[in-house]
Amino acid sequence: MSEHTDVLVLGGAGVDTIAYVPELPLPFQDSYVVAAIEPRAGQTGDNVALGLHTLGLRTMHVDVLGDDPEGDLVRAFHTRHGLPFAALPTAAGTKRAVNLVGPDGRRLSLWDGSREAEEDRYPAALIAAHTAHARHVHVCITPPGQHVFGQLNDLPVTVSTDLHNWDGAYEGFEVYAFNADLVFLSATALTDVAATMRRVIDRGRARLVVATDGAHGGSVLVRGETEVRRYAAVAPEAPVVDSNGAGDAFVSGFLFGHLAGEPLETCLRYGAIAGAYACTIPATRAGAIDRAALLRPAA
């Protein structure tokens, strides 16, 4: 493991098949004619790793992959972007999903739940080697990430996770919510955003919780503070075409600021800028904001 690693990203490597549909929700009918349906690598871990890498942070990505066409796409993605990647074999196959994308950029994701193997683990020796000199670890909510916190909690490294559209009740994500120092999630499925954020702080080790809410900005709660703060969204500089990956981009932008020692307000702005940029990139191609573009509006 290089001693010059800023962030280790665990999990979230996979393939999405993108279908642009005339509207969401999609009314029932026998068939629809849509534009080209394209499979492409770039699930949450791929996106976070690419975002950090593009911002100049030295990034290592580790995940389980199948010996299948989807795995080949993921390997090619990392090679194409010069992104260091360690693939561990899994009999379950590479993670995959079908994403329906509406004209306004909103996404409905159909996750293939068959591509998970209970026996999969990140080897302890591998984690030890890759965290020996890392500054930070980002754990995606994909198996076998739920098993790694026992080891990470004993290491002098900060940890983040993104709970995506967690409803605050699903117990399977609590291991992530309660064992990370920085917790990100979407507000879309939460009935009480503030209560969920306080529960994550009270039950776990989080230093702060960020709930993103798209064009409405979002909320942040810091340990030791009683009030939930609001932060503003950033208007995209180009038309919105796809929200896929916006949350991943927010995480990348926020972590860039956090690891640079920037104040919370700056980290939130970096995240908002990166997320807005991601909404202007079609999901059928990979693209992340670079450092110059991120810093230009924030200056």
Curated annotation (Swiss-Prot):
Q: What EC numbers are recorded for this enzyme?
A: 2.7.1.187
Q: Which InterPro entries does the entry mention?
A: Carboh/pur_kinase_PfkB_CS, PfkB_dom, Ribokinase-like
Q: Which SUPFAM superfamilies match?
A: Ribokinase-like (SSF53613)
Q: Is the keyword Kinase assigned to this protein?
A: yes
Superkingdom of this protein's organism: Bacteria
Coiled-coil region: none
MF-aspect GO terms: kinase activity
Among its keywords, does the record have Transferase? yes
Keywords attached to this Swiss-Prot or TrEMBL record, sorted alphabetically, are: Kinase, Transferase
Give the reaction(s) catalysed. acarbose + ATP = acarbose 7(IV)-phosphate + ADP + H(+)
Read off the PROSITE patterns from this record: PFKB_KINASES_2
Protein purpose: Catalyzes the phosphorylation of the alpha-glucosidase inhibitor acarbose. Phosphorylation of acarbose could be a resistance-like self-protection mechanism.
Give the family from UniProt.
Belongs to the carbohydrate kinase PfkB family.
Question: What is the name of the protein in this document?
Answer: Acarbose 7(IV)-phosphotransferase
Q: Which organism is it from?
A: Actinoplanes sp. (strain ATCC 31044 / CBS 674.73 / SE50/110)
Taxonomic lineage: Bacteria, Bacillati, Actinomycetota, Actinomycetes, Micromonosporales
Gene name?
acbK
